[in-house]
């Protein structure tokens, strides 16, 4: 049929074929399509001698099409907006299933196997977009109604974890982005989905709810917005601060300094209390500053990714509560949520910002945050509009509340695929075989192991001695280069062995150290052997570079 349709020079047949094609795209039943196909073949055979019959047939099919359109219009007059959106989405999924049936071959098809050493692109495609069971992948589609039934499912791609494995790649052991689990990556490959689809709405709503569990914040309002972790700074400054508000910034590295820069860009007045690289600000000095001036907010970088220094958040919030209880507490948890224990409500944190690509364990692209009831009240009592459009909670609050209530709302299009991945990861974190408390303990254990191994290799942490006991992150380690060695002696050679570490980042000593990430799936799934691998490879590189333990 498709081959005949390509004969465009046959005017009569082309007209009828176009009508048939339009009927197929519109999803007409198989019986009607078979009739149209028969008409096309008949018209082609009789073209030269039966032009009058051709015109009659064209007229008949056009009349049928008009009648069907009228019927569809009448039936749609009582259809709600949501039902219409669902119908469009279902039609798109049926179309995708049809296309998959024509294009996809099974994984064991020898003609699809990539040459040895080459990434199996087609095989990967078939595993992610596999046609529903029973589809004729070689010789055309099965019954369209079966595809429609499959398309109504709200599940992720039908490929099971046992059949999907991500392509071979270098082991990513930097403090974010991190390694992503196979099931999370597969969820990210979910077919394109309308953000108002009845299938997507509960996925978004449940993801919002699970954020509260991860941060132990039952009373707080979560936000899931397209963007990087840095967007969280903008959200805090745009919604909680107003022009000339004083903010006390506790900084332990590059990201604390950058947060202060962001606050200034929004019209605030940041005062930084910084510490030398590898240490933490003095709490007595912090308390003195709070007594000297009324600050609208205090910002804390829980773990600064540039140094791996861990702030004692409960100690800081206790000082705030006793000295300046009206001051808001804003916590940057980009490099801590998921790998460090957090009790947002109990600690008295008013705004927690983080991202998708670190302890949460999904690809980059989501700015995640939670606001306490006090933070929401502060926003609602502003004397000026929020200093931003995309960042305004006035726009986002109705959206988050709607989806949590299992109804759609719209301000800006959410990244549906990433939210499917987020849902999968959060479900594993909150309902999986490894509990949240066990997850945090596994990160503590892995951190101790890495730091002990570093010491045994004759290396030192960037963290100063007074911070090494309880002031270092459990999801990363910053390591000083041994005497006589530098980045070119370590990082490229690790990459050659299939492991990626991160370079230094602190402005005062970025060339003096490198950073190892150990969080997420690399820690929670010991069967991967990621920690074993990096320690073994690092020792090999050090020996090759001529380093001797002291």
Identify the residue ranges that each predicted region occupies:
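PLP-dependent enzyme catalytic core of the Aspartate aminotransferase-like
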Residues: 120, 512-550
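N-terminal "arm"/small-domain region of PLP-dependent enzymes with the aminotransferase-like
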Residues: 147-198
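Active-site C-terminal subdomain of aminotransferase-like
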Residues: 179-180, 357-452
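Conserved N-terminal alpha-helix of the aminotransferase class I/II PLP-enzyme fold
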Residues: 187-235, 239, 254, 258-264
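PLP-dependent aminotransferase-like
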Residues: 239-296
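Active-site phosphate-binding strand-loop segment of PLP-dependent enzymes
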Residues: 279-336, 351
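Conserved active-site segment immediately N-terminal to the catalytic lysine
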Residues: 345-357
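Conserved PLP-binding catalytic core of the aspartate aminotransferase-like
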Residues: 461-494
């Amino acid at each position: 049929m498709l081959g005949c349709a390509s004969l465009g020079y046959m005017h009569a047949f082309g007209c009828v074929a176009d009508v048939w094609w339009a009927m197929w795209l519109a999803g007409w039943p198989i019986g009607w399509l078979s009739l149209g196909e028969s008409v096309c073949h008949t018209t082609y055979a009789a073209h030269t001698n039966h032009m009058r019959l051709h015109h009659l047939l064209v007229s008949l099919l056009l009349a049928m099409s008009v009648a069907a359109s009228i019927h569809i219009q009448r039936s749609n007059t009582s259809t709600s907006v949501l039902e219409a959106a669902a119908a469009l989405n279902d039609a798109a999924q049926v179309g995708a299933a049809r296309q998959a049936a024509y294009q996809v071959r099974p994984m064991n098809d020898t003609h699809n196997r990539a040459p040895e050493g080459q990434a199996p692109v087609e095989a990967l495609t078939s595993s992610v977009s596999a046609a529903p069971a029973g589809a004729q992948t070689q010789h055309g589609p099965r019954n369209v109604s079966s595809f429609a039934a499959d398309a109504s499912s709200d599940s992720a791609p039908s490929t099971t974890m046992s059949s999907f494995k991500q392509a071979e790649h270098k082991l990513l052991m930097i403090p974010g982005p991190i390694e992503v689990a196979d099931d999370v990556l597969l969820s990210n490959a979910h077919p394109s989905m309308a953000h108002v689809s009845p299938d997507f709405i509960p996925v978004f709503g449940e993801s919002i709810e699970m954020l509260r569990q991860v941060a132990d914040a039952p009373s707080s309002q979560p936000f899931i917005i397209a963007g990087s972790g840095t967007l969280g700074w903008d959200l805090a400054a745009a919604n909680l601060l107003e022009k000339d508000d004083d903010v006390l910034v506790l900084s332990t590295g590059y990201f604390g300094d950058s947060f202060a820069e962001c606050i200034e860009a929004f019209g605030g007045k940041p005062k930084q209390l910084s510490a030398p690289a590898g240490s933490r600000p003095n709490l007595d000095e912090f308390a003195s500053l709070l007594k000297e001036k009324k600050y609208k907010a205090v910002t804390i970088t829980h773990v600064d990714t540039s140094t791996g220094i861990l702030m004692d958040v409960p100690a800081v919030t206790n000082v705030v509560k006793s000295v300046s209880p009206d001051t808001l507490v804003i916590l940057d948890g980009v490099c801590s949520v998921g790998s460090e224990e957090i009790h947002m409500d109990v600690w008295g944190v008013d705004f927690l910002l983080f991202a998708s690509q670190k302890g949460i364990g999904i690809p980059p692209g989501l700015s995640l945050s939670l606001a306490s009831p006090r933070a929401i009240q502060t926003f609602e009592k502003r004397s000026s509009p929020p200093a931003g459009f995309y960042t305004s909670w006035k726009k986002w609050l109705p959206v988050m509340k709607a989806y949590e209530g299992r109804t759609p709302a719209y301000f800006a299009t959410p990244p549906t695929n990433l939210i499917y991945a987020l849902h999968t990861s959060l479900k594993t974190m909150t309902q999986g075989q490894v509990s949240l408390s066990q997850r945090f303990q596994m990160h503590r254990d892995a951190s101790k192991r890495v730091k002990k191994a570093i010491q045994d290799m004759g290396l030192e942490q960037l963290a100063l001695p007074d911070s090494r006991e309880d002031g270092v992150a459990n999801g990363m380690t910053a390591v000083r280069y041994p005497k006589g060695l530098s980045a070119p002696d370590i990082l490229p050679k690790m990459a050659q062995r299939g492991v990626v570490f991160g370079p230094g980042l602190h402005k005062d000593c970025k060339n003096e150290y490198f950073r190892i990430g150990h969080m997420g799936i690399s820690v929670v799934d010991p069967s991967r052997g990621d920690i074993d691998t990096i320690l073994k490879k690092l020792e090999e590189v050090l020996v090759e570079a001529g380093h001797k333990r002291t």
